[in-house]
Amino acid sequence: MEETAHELTVKQYVEQQRELEREAREVLPYSFDTCTYSMGYLKQPLYACLTCQKASGSLNAVCYSCSISCHADHDLVDLFNKRHFRCDCGTTRTHSIPCNLRKSVDECGSENDYNHNFEGRFCICDTVYNPETEEGTMFQCILCEDWFHEKCLQKTNKGIAIPDAETFEWLVCSECSEKYRDHLLNQKHESIAGTERAPLFLSENFRENLCPCESCISLRNLEMPMLVAEEPIYEPPEDSEDGISEMNEDPSESGEMIEQVISSTMNDVLRILDRLPRVQANESVYAYNRLKSELTDFLTPFARENRVVTKEDISNFFLERSRISKNLR
C-alpha cells in the first residue's frame, strides 16, 4: 500500500513528535509548572492579561508559568522584565479565579506598580504595541521601565539623532532624566547635567560616573537601587528534556518503541489530570490506564512489522472501543 500524507509508521510518528518537541522547546524553553506568587516580589518576565482586565476592571500581570498554564487562551501582552512585582494570577486582579498552579485565590500584591504598559500601551506616544506591525527598535528606560520608539526618543532629544544602539547600554527617558538628573551624573558632565527634558544614553560603565555626594548616594540606595547595581532577574528553570526527545534514535525492540510513543503521548494527559478535582482525577486516571493498555496492544503489530498506521485504522480502534463500552453499560 502507498503511504499518503495522513499515513505514518510508528517510527515516522516518533520522529515527527521529536521534531515538534524541539520546535516547542525553542519557543517555550522554560518549565511552566510553578507560579512565582509564593516567591514574593521579583524582577521577572511578566504578561498583562487583557482578558482578565476586562472581567475584573483591574490592571494585572502574570508570571511566565501562569501565562501558559492559566491564561494561554487569553489576550496577553508581553511586558518583558518588570521589577519588584508579585504575580497577580489567582487574585482579585484576575477576577478571583484560582490559579491552576497553586490552586487558590490570594490577596493581590499591594506593592505592585502599574503603568499604561499593563493596558498594552507604550512610549510617550501611548500607542498600542502590535508585534505583527511594529517597525523599528524600542528601548526600555532603566528607571520607569516603559518602552520607547526610536523615532519618539529622537523627538524628545530635540530632533538630534540618538546614538547608535551599539554605543550605549541603558536608556533613561526624558521624563526620568528631568526628574532625577541632579542625582544621575557627576556635575563635571555639564553638557549632560544641564540638559532638560532629554533622554540619557548610558554606557555599560555609567555607574562609575554617578554623582558621588552623600545625598545622591542615599537617594539612589533608597529610590533607585537599579543605578547602584545591576538587578537580578528571575528566570524559570529550563524545561527538562524528558519524553519523546529522549527516545532512542532507533529502538531495536518494537515493544520499546511502542512504550516510548505511549509514554510521550500520555505525558500531556497526566499534566491535565493533575489540575482536575480529586474525584474526577481518580476516575480519569482509571480511564487513562485502560486506554494506554489498549492502545499499546493495538500499535504493537504495526511497530513490529513497520506497517503504516492509517486514519482508518485509528478510527476503527476508537469505534471498537465505543462499541465495547456501550455493550458494558
Swiss-Prot record:
Zinc finger (PHD-type) boundaries: 120-179
InterPro entries: UBR7, UBR7-like_UBR-box, Zinc_finger_PHD-type_CS, Znf_FYVE_PHD, Znf_PHD, Znf_PHD-finger, Znf_RING/FYVE/PHD, Znf_UBR
Signal among keywords: no
Gene3D superfamilies with a match to the protein in the record: Zinc/RING finger domain, C3HC4 (zinc finger) (3.30.40.10)
Highest taxon of the lineage: Eukaryota
UniProt record, GO biological process: chromatin remodeling
Alphabetical list of PROSITE patterns matching this protein: ZF_PHD_1, ZF_PHD_2, ZF_UBR
Zinc finger UBR-type: from-to: 33-104
Annotated keywords: Metal-binding, Zinc, Zinc-finger
MF terms (GO), sorted A to Z: ubiquitin protein ligase activity; zinc ion binding
PANTHER family reported for this sequence: E3 UBIQUITIN-PROTEIN LIGASE UBR7, E3 UBIQUITIN-PROTEIN LIGASE UBR7-RELATED
Family according to the record: Belongs to the UBR7 family.
Protein name: Protein mlo2
